[in-house]
Amino acid sequence: MDVARANSVMQTAAVAVARFMQQYDVILAPTLAEPPLELGRINLSPGISMAEWGPRVAAFSPFTQMANWTGQPSMSVPLGQSREGLPIGVMFTGRYGDEALLFRLAGQLEMAPPWAGRRPNLAAK
């Protein structure tokens, strides 16, 4: 698919999503399909082609793809945690131009347990 055709497809999707979102204030979805991974697991390393890397990323974060393609305002915020204490995120996706609602929702979650006052353990040598 050439660049002009790809842009046309993305624009068509953006218009369809805008129409769909007129019915909803926010769509809530998991940010990732599984708990957070160790750093570097899905990096684009020299031995991995884009054909291999793309599906890895899409499988790990399938719920973020539509917002990325259409430019919808979305925000990932921690809502729970894994057994290892890693944050488990949820993604709010809103209407075009209504980013303020996403920030208000995220602010309310940050004030609620277990995240209120929680800070990571950092060490410097």
Q: Language model features by range: what are they?
A:
Residues 1-69, 120-124:
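Serine-dependent amide/ester hydrolase catalytic core
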Residues 3-4, 8, 15, 58, ...:
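Structural helix-boundary/capping segments
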